[in-house]
Amino acid sequence: MESTTLSKPFKNQVNPWGPLIVLLILGRVNPVALGNSPHQVFNLSWEVTNEDRETVWAITGNHPLWTWWPDLTPDLCMLALHGPSYWGLEYQAPFSPPPGPPCCSGSSGSTPGCSRDCEEPLTSYTPRCNTAWNRLKLSKVTHAHNEGFYVCPGPHRPRWARSCGGPESFYCASWGCETTGRASWKPSSSWDYITVSNNLTSGQATPVCKNNTWCNSLTIRFTSLGKQATSWVTGHWWGLRLYVSGHDPGLIFGIRLKITDSGPRVPIGPNPVLSDQRPPSQPRSPPHSNSTPTETPLTLPEPPPAGVENRLLNLVKGAYQALNLTSPDRTQECWLCLVSGPPYYEGVAVLGTYSNHTSAPANCSVALQHKLTLSEVTGQGLCVGAVPKTHQALCNTTQNTSGGSYYLAAPAGTIWACNTGLTPCLSTTVLNLTTDYCVLVELWPRVTYHSPSYVYHQFERRGKYKREPVSLTLALLLGGLTMGGIAAGIGTGTTALVATQQLQAAVHDDLKEVEKSITNLEKSLTSLSEVVLQNRRGLDLLFLKEGGLCAALKEECCFYADHTGVVRDSMAKLRERLNQRQKLFESGQGWFERLFNGSPWFTTLISTIMGPLIVLLLILLLGPCILNRLVQFVKDRISVVQALVLTQQYHQLKSIDPEEMESRE
């Protein structure tokens, strides 16, 4: 832009089609698709870059994504590093002290080699950044009423701003492109992402410049639309030009967000979902040696990552420890079973006292990388946020967050179950900006408890239950222990809570593996990840079953436990217990029952020929009697027939009484 009287307006030009175009653009913007919990804390760095994309100023903090919008205060000369030659910083390195000697009138006094021209009248030459005197002139220009600077947006501008040009004109090829700055016409915009102004007043900047330091600090603030944008990771660009007589010098600067803890790296190669199917680690005894031991420094090797078997066995062992110390009568002899189908975990809503933190605690940065859903929550506990009516039955107490930015950390042994997933701590900024809600829960693995009689009957097949027995899960047996155990005054209070730490550690490790499986499946086959995930735990349990570590009971993988602990080789223990029951059963049988139990083929043979033998014996025993009866019956009928035949062939003579004849005579 050349300096002419008519070419420099005193107000911003407004495009009447601007609002409509902005709405269309916003309708097409897609937010960054991150699978993290919105409450997870990341290490965020807002960076201001020069034209070469070098970071010249940065500010870092630990906050949830899209909740931290600090004021950026880079120096104007820092933005000109490696810029056009008229700034005088072509060879200046980022984050280095400013070049040139200080002014002799500075607070440090007259030093050798100081510049005495700082007291001379300001000239009309182009202000530069290579000396303290030039930086002082630049400060006067940026604060002058009839001068100043203006800023034009880069590629994120709307389509109607095509006439604004590109980097060669610092995106300010025509008037009306400027959206912010410090100039007499007060440029502004309703759609740009930032506003830029001076950070220091003219009176504050003058002594700073004379002491040979960076003295042209700017204040960059995010607008409401800028806070809604989620494309800061790739960065946005602006052009800045000074408003002076003659040619307006300019520079290019950018703003970007750097997330240093954005989650696991994307693997290259085969799907790593089943890469951890390692056999369980067995304790090894040290080799025997007759040599004299020599003193060597003790070095502890790092433990290898737990395989599937170790991870699941630790889950069962933790469940046993917690159950044994709270209900020892239940662990005289029992079977603890892992289910192969989801849900793998269930929550119990509890009341607890969370802690407030003005800065993000350490556990806020280690949240799960994927939004894990807790599909089964029971009980009533503490709720935070806008809880819908469908979930208010889980709330015994509901607390609303007040204004301000702070963090709510869940008590030890608990976790926040939110509609956005599981998280160890909450950001009130996220809760106030959204309609999220969370319930404080204890997390229990879905481990079912079975009595030994039920398990043995299932394998012996001697009898059938008329109805399925009630499955007791760990949540039913131990629910509320973490927050309610001590308050209720149970006898095992402190000891039981200490025992739950092992279970919590196992739960944490297993949840990380489940989350890793979801992430890997999502990256490899998004459409099938939900289906394949249901088979993941089934595959894990299949490895345990094939290795003889557990007994398969319907859809469960069961581990034998008694007061000695969880038996690792559960299949061998099952065979041993079944053999014992078989011997006990046989000892109470007679010789006839033992005869049938001795040989399977003999039992089959007897059952096959028993019917024909019984029929033959009945014929031999009852046949003669029946035959005699039949013969006698036939003879009687023949005699009757013969009598009838004789009666038909002969007639009986009529007898005459002699006395009757004499009387007639």
UniProtKB/Swiss-Prot annotation:
SUPFAM superfamilies reported in the protein's UniProt record: ENV polyprotein, receptor-binding domain (SSF49830), Virus ectodomain (SSF58069)
GO cellular component assignments: host cell plasma membrane; membrane; viral envelope; virion membrane
GO molecular function: metal ion binding
Extracellular side, ranges: 32-605
Region Fusion peptide, residue ranges: 470-490
Keyword Phosphoprotein: no
InterPro entries referenced in this protein's UniProt entry, alphabetically: FMuLV_rcpt-bd (IPR008981), TLV/ENV_coat_polyprotein (IPR018154)
Keyword tags: Cleavage on pair of basic residues, Coiled coil, Disulfide bond, Fusion of virus membrane with host cell membrane, Fusion of virus membrane with host membrane, Glycoprotein, Host cell membrane, Host membrane, Host-virus interaction, Lipoprotein, Membrane, Metal-binding, Palmitate, Signal, Transmembrane, Transmembrane helix, Viral attachment to host cell, Viral envelope protein, Viral penetration into host cytoplasm, Virion, Virus entry into host cell, Zinc
Glycosylation sites: N43, N199, N211, N324, N356, N363, N396, N400, N432
Signal peptide feature range: 1-31
Any coiled-coil regions, as ranges: 505-532
GO biological process, one term: virion attachment to host cell
Cytoplasmic-side segments: 627-665
Binding-site residues for Zn(2+), renumbered to this chain: D117
Keyword Lipoprotein on entry: yes
Ranges where the record places region Immunosuppression: 533-549
Domain comment as written in the entry: The YXXL motif is involved in determining the exact site of viral release at the surface of infected mononuclear cells and promotes endocytosis.
Function (record text): The surface protein (SU) attaches the virus to the host cell by binding to its receptor. This interaction triggers the refolding of the transmembrane protein (TM) and is thought to activate its fusogenic potential by unmasking its fusion peptide. Fusion occurs at the host cell plasma membrane. The transmembrane protein (TM) acts as a class I viral fusion protein. Under the current model, the protein has at least 3 conformational states: pre-fusion native state, pre-hairpin intermediate state, and post-fusion hairpin state. During viral and target cell membrane fusion, the coiled coil regions (heptad repeats) assume a trimer-of-hairpins structure, positioning the fusion peptide in close proximity to the C-terminal region of the ectodomain. The formation of this structure appears to drive apposition and subsequent fusion of viral and target cell membranes.
PANTHER family in alphabetical order: BC035947 PROTEIN-RELATED (PTHR10424:SF72), VIRAL ENVELOPE PROTEIN (PTHR10424)
Subunit details: The mature envelope protein (Env) consists of a trimer of SU-TM heterodimers attached by a labile interchain disulfide bond.
Name the record gives this protein: Envelope glycoprotein
Record organism: Radiation murine leukemia virus
Protein encoded by which gene: env
